[in-house]
Structure formats: C-alpha cells, structure tokens
Amino acid sequence: MRSSPESRTSSSPGSVDDGGRTGTIFNIQRFSIEDGPGIRTTVFMKGCPLRCVWCHNPEGIEGRKQLMWFDVRCIGARDCLKACPLGALELGKDGMRIDRERCDGCGLCQEACPAGAIEVVGRRITAREAFEEVARDEAFYRNSGGGLTVSGGEPTMQPAFVAELMGLCREAGIPTALDTCGYCADDSLERLLPLSDMALIDLKLMDEAKHLELIGVELAPVKRSAATISHAGIPVWVRTPIIPGCTDTDGNIANLECVYYDDARPEWPRVVQCAEALWATSQQPHC
C-alpha cells in the first residue's frame, strides 16, 4: 500500500528529523542561479517521498547517508574493500556491489580509495552550521536579490531543521525560498511557508494514473499543496521538468495550464520551462 502525506508525522518515513538539532543534507550549492531569483545558496536536504523514473538526484532519495561508486574512476585497487570493517563491499566483473544493510556510512572506504571512485553522500549538519555556510555570500544576495533556497530531496521531510535554518537566515536579513515537490504533510508545509519569502513547486504530470505510475505517489496531495502555496501570499515559481514524450505532451501541458488558471494568483510571477511559452500565447482553457 502506498503511503499518503496525511498518514505521516513531521518525521516522515525516510526522514531524519531530530527536532531541529541536526539535518541530513547531500549538498550546499553556492552561486545557484536556477533555484529562485538572483544569486542563491541552495541547501539540498536528503530524503524524498517520490520515485520519479527520471530522477535527477537519486542520491537525495534516501534519508540517510549512503555510498556512491563511480565506475569510470575505479582503477581496481581494492583498497576500499580492505578498509571496510563491515565487509559491505564486493568488487566483481559487474562492478561494485554495496550491501546497504551493512554499510553504516563510516567513510573509511572513501578515505582509502586512491582514485576517488567511492564517496559517502550525505552529512549531518546543524542548522547553525548550515546558516554559517549560507551567510558567507550575504553580499551577493543583497546585490542580486538572491538568498537561501532549501531544496532536496524534499525539505518538508525535515521540517524542524529547515524551520530553524530559515529562521536564522531571516534574522540575518537573508531572503528564503522553499523548493518542494508538493507531496508533503500539511502541517510541515504550513510550518515552513510563513518562514519563506517565496516558494518553488514542481508540477510534473497532471494525469492521476501516469503520476502514480511514473512518480510513484498520488497526484491529489500535490495539487492540494499547490493550492495551499497559492494562498500563502508569497511569490511562486512553478517548474516542470522536460521529459520527452512524457511531460512535454500537448495533453499534459494543457492540464498544467488548467491548474495554473485555477490556482494562479498575482503572486505567481513566473512559470518556467516548457509550459511558459504556451501560457504566454494561449487563451484561458475551458477545463
């Protein structure tokens, strides 16, 4: 049975929320220009409830630290195997096999690899530590209209940590943005929106059956989150990934158009990627 956001607590399955003391991230990307206006720092949270077949950041799906092996870098030294105290690694003709039940993410294999072919993805960090990294570029935010964007993964799966980080940024005068997939618990979203100066939401497929098949979750909670965000009184960017033959079809774009006209407010100043041109030139649809 597929879980729904309503059945989740703020510490959702796959979440590592511990009350805000620390969070699990897989990247802090400085000088980001695609995750909101201006120059931004994007904090990528680990843990995502979706299972998109085209996932762009699969390392962000699991809520815990995990290993990534890069076959093009591997020189077959096997030092990583010798370094692993749990025997979680096996290198054969088909490549590296990682026993993820055994692996505890200690990182000894990464330290031992002479070619940098194996890496631990994910690190525990306090909200204060994350804020200090974000604050380094405060001058760039001030001069470009940028700020912090919290993305993922799905940031609402670690709401206490994200709330503390956003609060610290707001106290320092750094604008904040929440980038969500929309499949999230209502209480988590409602907790974070008041701390957000803008929101970004991904609307991928508007067909219920295809959404369930290709995204792995029901569509209704995503549409409900879009409606909640549209009434939050903050600017919103709607984003749609371009997946040929899937999200870029006339039918899907028309359905996205319907959602836009149903929920759009003056606070929705930008709709990006494939639907932008259609929305700019078409008449309001009869849905």
Regions found by a protein language model. Give the residues of each.
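Short, solvent-exposed beta-strand edge segments and adjacent coil->beta transition regions
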Residues: G38-R40, K93-G95, A115, G145-G147, ...
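Fold-independent oxyanion-binding glycine-rich loops
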Residues: I28, K46, P58, R100-E101, ...
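Conserved AdoMet/S-adenosylmethionine-binding subsite of the radical SAM
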Residues: R128-W279
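Short, conserved beta-strand segments within well-ordered enzyme catalytic domains
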Residues: T42-F44, E90, T149, A177
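Extended, non-globular alpha-helical segments
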Residues: W69-I75, G122-D137
